[in-house]
Curated annotation (Swiss-Prot):
Compositionally biased intervals (Basic and acidic residues): 113-142
Name this protein carries in UniProt: Tropomyosin
PANTHER family, per the entry: TROPOMYOSIN
Keywords: Coiled coil, Repeat
InterPro entries xrefs: Tropomyosin (IPR000533)
Organism: Acanthocheilonema viteae
């Protein structure tokens, strides 16, 4: 009887131990499953970060390409503006030369007008003298009258030429004024272009700094990609190790479950034997 009780106690202890081992195995499987899920979540986050890093790098490259295109356009505008300056300078030189020639022609016409005016005054004086002498010499009077008419014609011609010269001078002055306006506009354009060139230079310096920063960011991205790749490889290794561990644990759980079934069978057999023994004892 004591042997049977000891055997029953031993079987109960063995059964409890098996159940505890099975529970421990299940808990370990659950922990490994949770750990594997965390590893998979970390792997997904790493992949998202890698995609974001690639997108940032592509955007930086696109921004750099746009900046280079804008810089080329600015350089073309500056070159075009610089090409417009020499023709304006040549035009100003031609207008100045034309103005000098017009002033010279005006001086000549003015001298002729002064001479004609002097001749007319002299003729008028002579005419008055002749009138005071009561036209004593008709022939001389006619001569003087002819000279007077000629002088008047010369004066009219001088007036006409003076008007023509004045008109041409006004035209030249208007052309000169327009040329000065164009020259002033050209100078303003040059100032604007110089300012734009300065801005372009500053933008170029900024782009060079931005390009250097972009290269640094690219190096940083490459370093991050290498780090992420290493972490990914490490995560894959850990995942493979975890998978192998899970497989081993699963095998251990299966073994423990089989052992538990076996122990339950043994416990059932022992219980049946005990029942039969009790029946025999009580029957005895």
């Amino acid at each position: 009887m004591d042997a049977i009780k000891k055997k029953m106690q031993a079987m109960k202890i063995e059964k409890d131990t098996a159940l505890d081992r099975a529970d421990a195995a299940k808990e370990k499987v659950r922990q490994m499953t949770d750990k594997l899920e965390r590893i998979e979540e970390e792997l997904r986050d790493t992949q998202k970060k890698m995609m974001q890093t690639e997108n940032d790098l592509n955007k930086a490259q696109e921004d750099l390409a746009v900046a280079n295109t804008n810089l080329e356009d600015k350089e073309k505008k500056v070159q075009k503006a610089e090409a417009e300056v020499p023709p304006l300078n040549r035009r100003m030189t031609l207008l100045e030369e034309e103005l000098e020639r017009a002033e010279e022609r005006l001086k000549i016409a003015t001298d002729k007008l002064e001479k004609a005016t002097h001749t007319a005054d002299e003729s008028d004086r002579v005419r008055k003298v002749m009138e005071n002498r009561s036209f004593q010499d008709e022939e001389r009077a006619n001569t003087v009258e002819s000279q007077l008419k000629e002088a008047q014609l010369l004066a009219e011609e001088a007036d006409r030429k003076y008007d023509e010269v004045a008109r041409k001078l006004a035209m030249v002055e208007a052309d000169l004024e327009r040329a000065e306006e164009r020259a002033e506009a050209g100078e303003n354009k040059i100032v604007e272009l110089e300012e734009e060139l300065r801005v372009v230079g500053n933008n170029l310096k900024f782009l060079e700094v931005s390009e250097e920063k972009a290269l640094q960011r690219e190096d940083s991205y490459e370093e991050q990609i290498r780090t992420v790749s290493a972490r990914l490889k490490e995560a894959e290794t850990r995942a493979e190790f975890a998978e192998r561990s899970v497989q081993k644990l699963q095998k251990e759980v299966d073994r423990l479950e089989d052992e538990l079934v076996h122990e339950k069978g043994r416990y059932k057999n022992i219980s049946e034997e005990l029942d039969q023994t009790f029946q025999e004892l009580f029957g005895y």
